[in-house]
Amino acid sequence: MTADTGDTWHPGELTVQARTGVTEKMAGLGPRLIRDSMPDPHRDFFTRLPMIIVGGEDGAGYLWAAPLFGEPGFIRAPSSYLLTITLTAPCPHPLFSQLRVNSRVGLLGIEFESRRRNRVNGYIVQRTRDQIDIAVQQSFGNCTRYIQRRQRRHNPQHENVSTEIFTNWNRSLRNVITNADTCFIASACPGEHSENNRGVDVSHRGGDPGFIRFDKQQRLLIPDYAGNNFFNTIGNLVVDSRVGLLFLGFTEGHIISLTATAEVLWKIDEPVLCGEHDRVIRLTLEAGHIIRNALPCLWQSMHDAP
C-alpha cells in the first residue's frame, strides 16, 4: 500500500475498526503490514505451493472462492508487483472460465504443512488459456492460528471429476459443513482499479469441527474470532453482502463451493446467536457446486491446530 494511511483501509474496514475501538492502532499499523508489492519471502512462498485459493466475481455478479492446482512452480512472481499462475491442470470450477482482464481477484496461498498463509489482492492484467497474470495491489501475511496442519498425498480418483449444482441444503451437505474444520470465504468492496483498498479478498476460517453451524432457517453461522484487527472480510460485508464460500474435502477429494449473501451479527444485538463470540457471519445460500474428485491431492491431518 501507499504510505498514506487513508489509502490502507476502505470505509467498511474503518467502520468496523471504529466500532471495536482499534482505529488509532490500525492507522499506524496498516501501512506497515499491508503493502502494494510482495516481499521476497512471499514471492518464494508462492512458488512452493501446489494450490492457491482464488476469490472472484462471475459474469452474473456472484462471488465465489475456488482452488487452482499445479505442481510447485506453477505459481511464479516475476517481480514484486506481478503474480503469474500457469494453468497446467484442468480448472473444473466455472469461475475460471469467466475471469477476464481487469477482473478483481483475491488470492490466498496456504501451506498446510507449515501452517503459513500469505495473501495477494489485485486484478488480472493478462489472461490466456494457459496463464493468468495478476497485478499486485495488496500483499500481506496472516498468523498461523486456526490452521490445521496437514500432509499432502496423491488422490487416485482425481480423473473421475463430476459436478452437481444445488440451491438447497440436504442432509449430506449439512453433515459435511458442520463437521468441517476449515473453510475459505471470498468477499468484496466495489471500487475502481486505481483504488488499492477496494476489490476482492479471500480469507481462511478454521476451528474445531462444528465451529460452523446452521440456524433454524438453514442459514450458516460462522463465528468471527479475534484476530489481527484488519477486518478485511467483516469490513467488506459492511458495504457488500455478497460472499463465496469454499470447503475442501481433504480426505475424499471433493469440494463444495457456494455463493451466498451475508450479514454481520454483533453480540450486543444478538447475544444468543453470537454466544461467546463478538461477531458471527450469517449466510443465506444462493447456489452451490459439488465438484467430486476435484482435488488432485488429499491432505491427512497431522494434529489439531492451536
Go through each PLM region and give its residues.
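Binding-site signature for planar aromatic cofactors or substrates
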Residues: 1-306
